[in-house]
Amino acid sequence: SIILGEGNWDEGSTALFKNVYNEFPWYSEGVNGFVDVKDVARLMIMLMESDVSNERFIISAENISYQQLFEKIAAAFHKRPPHKKITPFLAGLAWRVERLKYRFSGKKPLVTRETATTALRESKYCNQKILNAFPEFSFTSIDETIKRVAASMQQKLNKP
């Protein structure tokens, strides 16, 4: 799962928000699990305070496509959503070009081999085990997370 939350605009999953804010035109139809950083923190505390030990859990709120994610982020920023579907060929070309740019400029690549591959893959995660362990817990919706994170970033950018 990809953890979504406030953070450095240029790193990690928060860079997805920056790309959409800047109206990056490309999207993929890959699917991944997404979860709010606050849910991860709450569940970590709940696990530490419980009798649960020697267990592994998948912490994921929702499985959605990158296209859906980007459309939701764009709506939160009142920006145009990505509108060009990336193909495996273009994704492969993109990470290679980014790697060349990095070698010559030292600037961190926007797309890596791993991110290109992940963006095209359909990875779905089941959160049932953690919900069985903590039936009182409910995940924050990805819509709510996106609205909160976008509002926070909008405020940092000092734009309405």
Q: What role is predicted for each listed range?
A:
Residues 34, 63, 124-125:
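Short aromatic/basic micro-patch
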Residues 27-28, 39, 88-134:
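A hydrophobic C-terminal alpha-helical subdomain
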Residues 121-127, 135-136, 143-153:
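C-terminal helical cap and adjacent loop that interface with cofactors, partners, or active-site loops
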Residues 43-110, 141-142, 147-160:
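Mid/C-terminal beta-alpha module of Rossmann-like enzyme folds, strongest
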Residues 11-12, 28-48, 55:
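Substrate-positioning beta->alpha
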